[in-house]
């Protein structure tokens, strides 16, 4: 089939690669414009643009596709059979959604209608969801409200961060989208109601859970929260959760909540530390112990093990290297919050 592909981050690249390798004709790739990134703030293409150029695909980079009528006309003139959208980052206008005869299909990283909108991977971890997945959804004007053609679930591991979960979902999204293409092609064009019947889609309820945009305040750790809440924030917002260590910003990159009921899901090193400190006996944020695997810190309830972190101006470190870098001693305290 002739496919118009829409995507921006590295998460979308496996789907582009998979469709290209399967022999589908990628008639165009639409992605966000180049942005300044990194310490040098150099103008850099999106991961999807970089890969599309390697594949020799025509690339389009509208700043605002809803306002760019010239770009809309160029894209519609490509006469794609179908549009495939994976984490593009802009809302598509009605004319773009309705132009391909076989529709616009989105690979969404959640179990719809839970976590519609941006950041479904982060929010599934932040809220402690036991599982998530990918849905191949027909796009309509509502935000992630369209009927779902294919869906696959996977469990979320306690010690899995958003990047790791995103990599698994990215591969799953690519596989499901490839499975969806012959089904969509076989159903053919036609009236919407007839197509949905032929495709046997699952219609979503009107009500759903929306993933709100994250703010800077969301990334600040509060040691007065429970160990599990702090851990979910560290893993869900990886690598952005921050606190203060001796007036310097500290990124906390990996933790384990030292909670007895979760012991089976912890590492051997963390499991050996469970139950060694009285719950609530120390002020939040106080260093309780320097272990080979990192720092044990008090919270509201059970303590938490910081396995990996990055002090402002330093390289990331873990275990004993982290303790040496911070020169941490029992009784030292982490700040309640820091500017991200």
Curated annotation (Swiss-Prot):
> What would be the name of the gene that encodes this protein?
fmt
Catalysed reactions, semicolon-separated? L-methionyl-tRNA(fMet) + (6R)-10-formyltetrahydrofolate = N-formyl-L-methionyl-tRNA(fMet) + (6S)-5,6,7,8-tetrahydrofolate + H(+)
- Task of the protein: Attaches a formyl group to the free amino group of methionyl-tRNA(fMet). The formyl group appears to play a dual role in the initiator identity of N-formylmethionyl-tRNA by promoting its recognition by IF2 and preventing the misappropriation of this tRNA by the elongation apparatus.
The family database entries (InterPro entries) matched by this protein are listed as: Fmt, Formyl_trans_C, Formyl_transf_N, Formyl_transf_N_sf, Formyl_transferase-like_C_sf, Met-tRNA-FMT_C, Met-tRNA-FMT_N
The species is Synechococcus sp. (strain WH7803)
Provide the alphabetized UniProt keywords. Answer: Protein biosynthesis, Transferase
Major enzyme class: transferase
One annotated GO molecular function: methionyl-tRNA formyltransferase activity
By sequence similarity, the record places it as follows: Belongs to the Fmt family.
E.C. code: 2.1.2.9
What name does the UniProt record give this protein?
Methionyl-tRNA formyltransferase
- Any one annotated GO CC term: cytosol
Claim: Transferase is one of the keywords in the record: yes
Keyword Protein biosynthesis assigned to the entry: answer is yes
Q: Give me the residues that bind (6S)-5,6,7,8-tetrahydrofolate, please.
A: 110-113
